[in-house]
Amino acid sequence: METVISRFLRYVSFDTQSNEESETCPSTEKQRALGKALVEEMLALGITDAHMDENGYVYGTVPGDPSKPVVGLIAHMDTAPDASGAQVKAKIVPFDGSDICLNEEKQLYLRQADYPELAQHIGKRLIVTDGTTLLGADDKAGVAEIMSAAAALLHSDKPHATLKIGFTPDEEIGRGADLFDVEKFAADYAYTVDGGLIGELEYENFNAAGAKVVCNGLSIHPGSAKDKMVNAQLIAMEFQSMLPQAQRPEHTEGYEGFIHLTGMEGSVEHASLHYIIRDHDMEKFQQKKQLMTAAAAFLNEKYGAGTVELTLKDSYFNMLEKIQPVMYIVERAKNAMEHEGITPIVVPIRGGTDGARLSFMGLPCPNLCTGGANFHGRYEYIPVEDMERITKMLVTLLCEAE
């Protein structure tokens, strides 16, 4: 039987980077190549209903005991636009605590001094990059772990819940749940396998919104600008200065939310600012949006109506309110982890997942660990042993479901 590691190494050879500038689904055709390969592999395993729909979503079913609930496992096929996912050259390195040379020519090293959490992996084998690309453990590790768990269930005589498999495109650009067919998926509940270090279990995420601020100025020759020119760029700077410095991402952690300036461009006539707003607490989330609204109103009163145009758009919400009524699904995940000797680490997601959106679409969906770390960059890694244990944990989760 193929191992979770061999699957993972095969999957990362596919370049599946998504593209937020594209309006198609999937956003890049190359994601379909992995989807097609997964369908072929699922059919070969005996998952007879495996298919990819017109939007690049992959579905399949491992039938189980009809007296047990129907449980979904979901992962995403795309990798982040932040770093190249083409021609990934993954390698397995025994880790003894010493610096790991990723690329001798570029003098790139994965060092415990830079990433202290590496200390917990001494004695394990780490899958790393050659320093020129990301690895793709986010989330091809999740895909490999789900596929390997499905294969194990198909070869097991032990009673287990029916498993519904879902692989999504475009999660990294926030669209993974957009066209997910919850009704066709027909699971009682599900888990995304898209988390980090082994043991992480997440059922809280940010409430999220985007904001666009457009500042309108008046250009005139600077030689005759006195009492006439209105510089939109300076108004944009004034708007930014009215937001609390302590609520920037670089100053926050845990349950602390933030207002993050993600982009800006401008001239004397027009300037624009782009923000993302995040907070786990709905009241604080609304306060952040109200603060931006108040700043825009103040500047319009100061410089004249229409000087500042603010557009706010909610993106997703904290899944906690949808998980709390069914907390037994979190307890089942904890029990499966403990059964495999994994200590559950419940942490808030400082971001979002497909599961957050799916929870509001009627499919409660906490997030489980993959084992990986340093996602979206050249220092991404994942321990072999942790992938193997997580695969066993997923099997236990399906077998122990009641």
Regions found by a protein language model. Name each.
Residues 147-154, 238-245, 396-399:
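Short glycine/serine- and small hydrophobic-enriched flexible loop segments
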Residues 234-251, 258-260, 307, 317-365:
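Active-site-adjacent substrate-binding region
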Residues 68-159, 167, 187:
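Active-site metal-coordination/substrate-binding segment of hydrolases
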Residues 267-269, 344-398:
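Zn-dependent metallopeptidase/amidohydrolase metal-coordination segment
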Residues 100, 124-137, 170-293, 297, ...:
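Midchain, well-structured core segments that form catalytic/ion-binding scaffolds
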Residues 23-68, 72-74, 78:
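A non-catalytic alpha/beta surface segment that caps or lines the substrate-entry region
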Residues 49-54, 262-265, 347-348:
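Short beta-strand
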Residues 2-29, 128, 316, 376-377:
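N-terminal capping segment at the start of a domain
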